[in-house]
């Protein structure tokens, strides 16, 4: 249980909303959503744990209970929370508990961190609709969006800055290709 289970308000610019999603390694999730039309910014960080100000070593050491997650700042006139969730579910495996590929542990859990009751309802309905598309049950959690801790600078825009790194070539690039294949009309600058 997080040390603080109350939803924390996030400051956004006028005309902007925020979604907080955890779908395995934040490098992957960030790389996918940075390409999506209507998304203004994506920030990698940690949420849902039991200590304040966690760092990467602590989170990966499974000592904090935090998930690697991203905060997605988006323009609701160009996209919406349900569309973000559709991309989220199609670009990671929501049926594996605390695991995405070779990455295992609670920090890699699949979670939707909701900022309000409307997001909670949209998340539930989207999971019900998409659940029929999977052979195994969806294990994605719906959790309150507690305090989000921005990850260390070297994690931000990791794929964009390190496209030739081994993990990026082996794992992140595959997620980006999946996004491009399934959501070509949602790629920034696609004109659709």
Swiss-Prot record:
Its EC number is 1.8.4.11. One of its GO terms (molecular function) is peptide-methionine (S)-S-oxide reductase activity. It is an enzyme of class 1 (oxidoreductase). Keywords: Oxidoreductase. InterPro entries: Met_Sox_Rdtase_MsrA_dom, Met_Sox_Rdtase_MsrA_sf. GO terms for biological process: protein modification process. It comes from the Bacteria. The active site is at residue 25. It catalyses: L-methionyl-[protein] + [thioredoxin]-disulfide + H2O = L-methionyl-(S)-S-oxide-[protein] + [thioredoxin]-dithiol; [thioredoxin]-disulfide + L-methionine + H2O = L-methionine (S)-S-oxide + [thioredoxin]-dithiol. SUPFAM superfamilies: Peptide methionine sulfoxide reductase. It holds the Pfam family PMSR. Has an important function as a repair enzyme for proteins that have been inactivated by oxidation. Catalyzes the reversible oxidation-reduction of methionine sulfoxide in proteins to methionine. Belongs to the MsrA Met sulfoxide reductase family. NCBIfam families: msrA. This is Peptide methionine sulfoxide reductase MsrA 1. It comes from Rhodopirellula baltica (strain DSM 10527 / NCIMB 13988 / SH1).
């Amino acid at each position: 249980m997080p040390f603080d289970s109350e939803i924390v308000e996030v400051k956004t610019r006028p005309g902007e909303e925020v979604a907080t999603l955890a779908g395995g390694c934040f490098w992957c999730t960030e790389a996918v959503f940075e390409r999506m039309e209507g998304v203004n910014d994506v920030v990698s960080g940690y949420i849902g744990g039991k200590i304040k100000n966690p760092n990467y070593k602590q989170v990966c050491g499974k000592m904090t209970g935090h998930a690697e997650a991203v905060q997605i700042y988006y323009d609701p006139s160009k996209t919406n929370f349900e569309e973000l969730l559709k991309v989220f579910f199609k670009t990671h495996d929501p049926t594996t508990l605390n695991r995405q590929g070779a990455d295992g542990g609670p920090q890699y859990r699949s979670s939707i961190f909701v900022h309000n009751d409307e997001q909670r309802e949209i998340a539930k309905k989207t999971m019900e609709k998409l659940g029929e598309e999977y052979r195994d049950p969806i294990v994605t959690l719906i959790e309150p969006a507690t305090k989000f801790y921005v990850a260390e600078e070297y994690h931000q825009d990791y794929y964009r800055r390190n496209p030739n790194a081994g993990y990026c070539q082996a794992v992140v690039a595959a997620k980006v290709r999946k996004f491009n294949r399934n959501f070509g009309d949602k790629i920034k600058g696609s004109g659709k």
